[in-house]
């Protein structure tokens, strides 16, 4: 139940009650969410703890300036069948083939790589070498983003922001928390 998950998360995350509530709404409505906040506010811990409490497969993708689309979606490799010695392509799935994806610092990678991730979010599949590969169900992307004014960021275009149903602002806990 949502209350059980919320209480599990509150054991790990101090404060951030509104953030926990909004993330749970995103998950239970089967939508993606973008968490915006400076580093060090437990965004990553929240998402990994959420996956654990829901018993879903979880992968973290650290978005960096040199990350390539195939690092996310997977790639085809040439495979030699030992019995026939015939060469063929074999698909190796990338980390996006998981139930909950933490797209960490999504605005630190160039637009081409962002687009590969965001297309998968929209279509819930990956197209490689002319073949479609369905993503698991359920499939959620919870992305983190540093504020745009920070150096070394690539702002997400409006069309890509539309892939996220929720933009959740993560701030420092107040004194009481």
Please describe what each predicted stretch is:
Residues 38, 72, 144:
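P-loop (Walker A) phosphate-binding loop of NTP-binding proteins
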Residues 22-25, 80-102:
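Conserved alpha-helical scaffold flanking the Walker A/P-loop in AAA+ ATPase domains
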Residues 79-84, 109-113, 121-177:
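Canonical AAA+ ATPase core
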Residues 1-41:
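Pre-Walker A (pre-P-loop) alpha-helix and adjacent loop at the N terminus of AAA/AAA+ ATPase modules
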Residues 104-105, 116:
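Walker B catalytic acidic pair
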Residues 68-84:
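Conserved NTP-binding/hydrolysis module of P-loop NTPases
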Residues 24-65:
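Walker A/P-loop
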Residues 33, 101, 139:
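Conserved beta-strand position immediately N-terminal to the Walker
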């Amino acid at each position: 139940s949502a209350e059980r998950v919320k209480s599990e998360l509150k054991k790990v995350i101090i404060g951030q009650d509104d953030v926990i509530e909004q993330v749970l709404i995103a998950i239970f409505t089967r939508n993606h969410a973008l968490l915006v906040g400076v580093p060090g506010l437990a965004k990553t811990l929240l998402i990994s703890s959420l996956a654990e409490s829901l018993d879903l497969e979880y992968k973290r993708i650290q978005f960096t300036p040199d990350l390539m689309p195939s690092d996310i979606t997977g790639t085809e490799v040439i495979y030699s069948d030992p019995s026939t010695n015939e060469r063929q392509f074999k698909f190796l799935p990338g980390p996006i083939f998981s139930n909950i994806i933490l797209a960490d610092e999504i605005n630190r990678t160039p637009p081409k790589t962002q687009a590969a991730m965001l297309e998968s979010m929209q279509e819930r599949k990956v197209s490689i070498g002319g073949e479609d590969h369905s993503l698991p169900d359920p499939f959620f992307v919870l992305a983190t983003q540093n504020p745009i004014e920070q150096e070394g960021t690539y702002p997400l275009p409006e069309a890509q922001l539309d892939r996220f149903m929720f933009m959740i602002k993560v701030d420092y806990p107040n004194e009481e928390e």
